[in-house]
């Protein structure tokens, strides 16, 4: 119980419940509870029987909590942070028995995370799985101290551990971060790791208390501006699931970016109702940067840089060609847009204000120097947008000037109006202005047999700002389907036709003409006529 207020029914006290999941009695004498800031005094002489519970709290809470089960108190009981904390349980010999690092997201319930409800483990036979094995309590009192958790259920861990990222402590020491705790012995086996670039590993140490990190010590130093690749094999999690395909990670020595080595690449300043702003940055250099040493900011009404926010509270390297996104709510972002690389999205509480009409987005390095700045305006969006809400503003050319309106364009509708964590839909690749339309296959049979059921209309343009309309005609020249209407285009994309008309009725077999009109506000216009045959198998 990290946040007992507002009270539901349980006492207004913080506490931690322990369960003996072994087959033997355990004497908790001299065991300790701790968090990131320190640890408690020793526990008293208390024997916890198998499959039994005990509530641990401060001395002042004992009387209130005794109504719910057996209770022991400790001095210097850790203050359980409402928003999240790292907790560990250590034996009388100092051995870490269990550790968790909870956050508000672990409640998996926006109402209950606001207080008054316990955070409960679902399956005590699966103690290392983190958020996937915890949720808010469901007992009507707000929790179930001293008895089996109300959320108790079988929740087997069958997922392989994977690597989240890696970072360098210095030029001889690397830390690999896994997405869950790994077996400390296998994590500390040097032969389970290899690194390219002529580097050899001297030692591997599993880092307590969570054991989700391993520190590698090298025999030779890493070189600047060099990307090294680490491969991990035979490392397992607590349930002996072996690491799978996500067993490779890049590492190197980060530096501070100078002007425009890293750029503002995409801005959502006018989100959908209930949504959140986001900013995407792109590393256009051949260097490595650390998000833990970069800041996003804006300018106040006096033109002074203000509202400075760190991109990441933990080390996260941005390699050449990488993207990173900051927002206030990663769940909202994933609901509103396709996020190809969730690990590259970082939550920044209270982002700087980015007004809907105009504003400043600034990227600062660790010295406070401006790396890039974009002074956007709402009229930088595509003029024919029916509704600009939820439409991200994308940089066209990473090598172009950040302050030029012509280097920005609305994200394409065919890309979902935003491309956080991956290449912009309006990214400029070529200088010519031609467009192409191609249909595959030339003959399709929409009978749901899994073979050529749809016709795919692929397009390519060589500059942003185009709009497309597609009308499908039968062989007699009659319009049967308005497939696309005023769709803003990226540089490439596609639509599909399922062989149905505007009323979603099957069309007859035969030849159909797809009439495609592509135009922009500068008066450029291209017309395409493509033929496709709709066929069906004979019964």
Where are the model-predicted features located?
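Activation on beta-sandwich/Ig-like modules and their edge loops
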Residues: 1-130, 137-140, 153-404, 430-440, ...
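Extracytoplasmic Ser/Thr/Pro-rich, glycosylation-prone low-complexity segments
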Residues: 135-147
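Short, compositionally biased serine/threonine- and acidic-rich segments at solvent-exposed termini, linkers
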Residues: 400-435
